[in-house]
């Protein structure tokens, strides 16, 4: 985690990330039944391996108090087949439950989510500049796009839904030329699922993982080599591919936090 995120990750941070995984996995399994995210995503697999080692401590009992919550999610999710409706439910859960359950993380990292209208304006403005100045579009082959602070994936999902990427361009763009980074585990999970669900809704067919997303600190990832890649090899490999890519377009909204009066001022300076 120190390698993939940053050197300031503490033991408490690691414990909280495992707690996030324990709490959220049942939610995603309910919302995206049959979806292969939890078995295919490299970070989810790495977290699950750590929990498998800890199973002897009967960790399941720690989440039994949440059974009513999981049951309510199952009830709300039953019958929802529209990917956008599931997206809305996931983001609502994040805003009303997850962000409050892990308030220290959200306060520390200054998490802010951009209104969809602003996201759409930014995406279309970038496409116009590409056309006017470079004779290309966001769908053009060779135009690598990154959202370095993806949050729950709104910029990427709206890009896919924008109509600016032609149907014949979509598969190549999705598989090879769209990149996203996120440092908060919960948001990373939600972003990956949202992006994959939107792509599947557009293209249909079999499940296709979004291999362009990394659990990483964008500010730190260019400052050191992979030192412990054996622990999260697939995520580290994604980071290496991203660093080797010729990024042409950066879209997004950097996280910020105002008025912090704690040790977390160091986080402010990282974004500042």
Task: Indicate where each model-derived feature is located.
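Non-catalytic, mostly N-terminal accessory regions of nucleic-acid modification and defense proteins
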Residues: 1-117, 199-212
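SAM-dependent methyltransferase catalytic region
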Residues: 85, 97-270
């Amino acid at each position: 985690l120190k390698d993939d995120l940053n050197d300031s990750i503490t033991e408490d941070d690691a414990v909280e990330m495992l707690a996030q995984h324990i709490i959220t996995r049942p939610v995603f399994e309910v919302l995206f039944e049959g979806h292969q995210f939890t078995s295919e995503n490299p970070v989810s697999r790495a977290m699950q391996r750590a929990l498998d080692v800890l199973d002897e401590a009967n960790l399941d009992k720690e989440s039994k108090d949440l059974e009513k919550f999981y049951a309510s999610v199952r009830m709300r999710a039953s019958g929802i087949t529209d990917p956008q409706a599931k997206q809305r439910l996931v983001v609502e859960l994040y805003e009303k439950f997850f962000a409050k359950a892990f308030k220290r993380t959200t306060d520390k990292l200054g998490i802010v989510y951009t209104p969809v209208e602003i996201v759409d304006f930014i995406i279309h403005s970038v496409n116009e500049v590409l056309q006017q100045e470079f004779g290309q579009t966001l769908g053009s082959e060779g135009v690598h796009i990154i959202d370095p602070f993806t949050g729950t994936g709104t910029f990427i999902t709206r890009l896919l839904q924008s109509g600016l990427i032609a149907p014949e361009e979509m598969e190549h763009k999705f598989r090879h030329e769209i990149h996203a980074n996120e440092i908060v585990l919960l948001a990373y999970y939600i972003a990956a699922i949202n992006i994959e669900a939107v792509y599947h809704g557009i293209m249909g067919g079999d499940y296709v993982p979004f291999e362009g997303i990394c659990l990483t600190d964008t500010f730190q990832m260019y400052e050191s080599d992979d030192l412990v890649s054996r622990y999260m090899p697939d995520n580290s490999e994604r980071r290496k591919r991203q660093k080797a890519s010729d990024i042409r377009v950066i879209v997004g909204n950097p996280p910020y936090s105002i008025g912090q009066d704690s040790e977390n001022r160091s986080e402010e300076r990282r974004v500042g």
